[in-house]
Amino acid sequence: MSKLTIVRGFNDVLPLDSYKWQFLESKVKLILDRYNYSETRLPIVERSELFHRSVGESSDIVSKETYDFQDRNGDSLTLRPEGTAGCVRMVIENNLATRGQTQKLWYCGPMFRYERPQKGRYRQFYQLGVEAYGFDGIAIDLEVIAIAWSLFKELGISEYVTLELNSLGSSLNRQEYTQALLQYLKPYHAELDEDSIKRLDKNPLRILDSKIEKTQKILANAPKLIDFIDHDLRLRFKQTCQYLDALGVRYKLNENLVRGLDYYTGLVFEWTTDKLGSQSAICAGGRYDGLVENLGGQKIAAIGFAIGMERLLLLLEDLGKLPNQDNACDVFFILDSAQLHQSLAIVENIRQELPQLKIDMDLKFGSFKSQFKKADKSGAKVAIIIGQDELDNGFAGIKFLQQNEEQQQVAFNELINFLER
């Protein structure tokens, strides 16, 4: 029978790597607690219509990349390709964003897109999402950016990432700009790359995001979106930049930054790095003030961002910013298999009384010699021996594995005090 293998584009997190995730997740929680954001947990399956109405039917994600299927009732369902739409659905369904209410939320979990797998891009990938609802002013824009900046500083990578900013204006601004862009591109139709030609009919703004050099040269003299944005929104964007200057957050303006999701309005941003090759974006977000209303809720201001956790881990690893793994246990018990009913009770009592200790043993209970070999391999500092003689005398044997000392004895009723020292 052939050996089963993992699905292409999916990854196992092996025991030797799980500590990296635990480290990153602990830093994420530390920062989000600092800003008083509440964790929420969302289903990985949503109705397909949710993403059609939010991400956009013409977007690359919905048109090319979603995992869609019908359940046994014939309902069209989708493995979530991103988290914002599901979070908005939850907020609406549970009346968390009615007028006057505010919410500051975060979540972390797997997303699914059928893309060509490569370093930093997978078909199942983990994403941290941070979302805020009901805040109209600039202050929330700055706070959301500051959260990402604080996380990068906490991880020691702030000097290796760059914040890029743009404003998409209102939906009317974008409609007017789209017409001007199409008019400009008409003479260049035959010279555009294949993807850009497809986007002319479906999502022309995405052409600005093309990485093809020839297309970029064509766009060099194209109309600028900023020239079509209302005065008030342009002033708000300018003020946002001024506040970031005051906060000491480095950034650069990127007039071609448009984001690949249809729901964004106003401010959009990305954090990029030059350390990961083509997968340079590690964080992206912006305002999506119309999405709650578009999905059946009230008209509520909203902003958020997402961080690709695998890409962030790759960056941390490449820069040597991950801590060394410490798999060593603290205490290794060496037990007599004939007396397990007594010795295991002692071990379990110590585990309950001293939960901070990592305690292990050889569950095959071989000879004492073989158990000592496993104790040495475990990296434990101390081996505690409980055999028939120890039980008869009321004393456990103590062997310091990393020191050249004689074996000691400690009374069973003093073991906890001994291990606390």
Swiss-Prot record:
Pfam families to which the protein is assigned, alphabetical: HGTP_anticodon, tRNA-synt_His
Annotated signal sequence range: none
Organism: Francisella tularensis subsp. holarctica (strain OSU18)
NCBIfam families xrefs: hisS (TIGR00442)
Lineage top rank: taxon: Bacteria
Localization per record: Cytoplasm
Reaction(s) this enzyme catalyzes, per UniProt: tRNA(His) + L-histidine + ATP = L-histidyl-tRNA(His) + AMP + diphosphate + H(+)
One GO CC term, this protein: cytoplasm
Record has Cytoplasm as a keyword: yes
EC code: 6.1.1.21
Main localisation: cytoplasm
Name used for this protein in its record: Histidine--tRNA ligase
